[in-house]
Amino acid sequence: MPNIIEITDFAAPELDIYARLTEGQLLNRHEPDKGIFIAESPKVIERALDAGCVPISMLMEKKHVERQAREIIRRCGDIPVYAAEFDVLTQLTGFHLTRGMLCAMYRPPLPGTEEICAGARRIAVLENVMNPTNIGAISVSYTHLLRAAKSY
């Protein structure tokens, strides 16, 4: 049974995950097996659950609790579900929530080198990348570079 909690106090430490911790603090570099990530839409939350990620809590617009989020909340089990009106959430997070729903989850264990490299023809090592958007940009640039090299 989910624990639906209406947000009235933004100072609650339980909301730090969503409002006050940096990406680096969520990642927990010193103990990566205890790292956390934020899934930022119903589709991403569902995919993370399908992949076996373990939810910690959810933050969403109040209107989604009995509608769009009902099945996701059921799948998450007995976790806190923080809910508030749209304007209240915007004040808390400082930005417009993607599809009105966030879910804090434990990061899955990192795979070993052997598992990553098994069957790979090429491997790119990207160090100190904090924003996944940068990985996409690097991948696109690499693809264009390969195409250009083949045309010569």
Regions found by a protein language model. Name each.
Residues 67-78:
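Short, aromatic/basic amphipathic alpha-helical patches
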Residues 143-144, 148:
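Conserved small/polar residues in nucleotide/adenosyl-binding loops
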Residues 90:
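Glycine/small-residue-rich loop that forms an oxyanion/phosphate-binding "nest" at active or ligand-binding sites
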